[in-house]
Amino acid sequence: MKTEVAEAIAEITRGAEEVLLEQELAEKLASGKPLTVKAGFDPTAPDLHLGHTVLINKLRVFQDFGHKVVFLIGDFTGMIGDPTGKNVTRKPLTTEQVIANAETYKEQVFKILDPAKTEIRFNSEWMSKMGAADMIKLAARQTVARMLERDDFKKRYQNNQSIAIHEFLYPLVQGWDSVELKADVELGGTDQRFNLLMGRELQKEEGQRPQTVIMTPLLEGLDGVQKMSKSLNNYIGITEPANDMFGKIMSVSDELMWRYFQLLSFRSITEIDELKAAVADGKNPRDVKVLLAKEIIARFHSEDDAEKAEQDFIQRFQKNALPDDIPEKTVQVGAEGMAIGNVLKEAGLVESTSEALRMIKQNAVKVDGEKFSDSRYLCTEKDSGVYQVGKRRFAKINLTA
């Protein structure tokens, strides 16, 4: 393998969970032909978050090696609703919602990608031209048994949970997108494996060379458990104010911090290993987390904004003398929420709800450094954060439904 190709593969596959097949990728890169690299995004909400950027960063790497990136906005597929990882049928979006959200995607993606090397496409370009007969012919290429090999469909079927017929079309449509684009490479998360391989199958049937599939790991959300998702409200949006982004990044656990370095930072592996060694030798993990926060904010805002966000964080949090060893608690608040007094009691910050109410009345309760005064407030998942009662009682409370 030529040195140039080996170097390209090392950069392209860095952090990837799986590559199918690496030898195919090497042959395509060795050809010297600019490759068509595809990644699809369904506009299910109007803002990109850091979880999306794991893929987009990888697309940028391909661009830096001279290849063409197709950022495919699944406006047609978005009206189906991706069933991946869901145990219920996802409600499809309206045409108006899809169009509005897609426009926002277009505005945001160039914060990372080079506009001159990016082709923005919508899969409605070809899918909306398909008639009933064409769609039936496409559906006939696969069997129900094959579709039930997909984990989420299999689980729902075994649990007697409904699966709508249109959900079976989603992998086929995503696969057909690869045929229409003549994709050489497709990127996707590990949860998209079934759909990505469908593209290879359909391309073979159409006489095309099957796309190489590169699967990137899923980025965990702020809770450190479930994947970052707008619908789970555990995400950091790339257009959020710099101060908000800084605070959210600083709130992640030390363990999750290293995961974010691996998948979001452009620092070399050597640099990250040096930071790990420094922490092992006694360096405060919070100082390292600041480096991560500033790098990400500089990317999506500016270096000046990153500096200002750090100063704002210092004023709001560090001057309030937050301890380094804040215990982490998980409190289940239910779909309708839980009263703030009960949350404080469940987290062990007070002995009773009456004490909680008394402390709130005395302005002795803070959430993320801000005084809390509403004793009737119902806490929901979005209210996770650092809770303080008095001067010495702290807890990082993760609220779950």
Curated annotation (Swiss-Prot):
Its main location: cytoplasm. GO terms for molecular function: ATP binding; RNA binding; tyrosine-tRNA ligase activity. The keyword Cytoplasm applies. Keywords: Aminoacyl-tRNA synthetase, ATP-binding, Cytoplasm, Ligase, Nucleotide-binding, Protein biosynthesis, RNA-binding. CDD domains: S4, TyrRS_core. It catalyses: tRNA(Tyr) + L-tyrosine + ATP = L-tyrosyl-tRNA(Tyr) + AMP + diphosphate + H(+). It is found in: Cytoplasm. GO terms for cellular component: cytosol. ATP binds at residue 230. A motif ('KMSKS' region) lies at residues 227-231. This is Tyrosine--tRNA ligase. It comes from Idiomarina loihiensis (strain ATCC BAA-735 / DSM 15497 / L2-TR). The gene is tyrS.
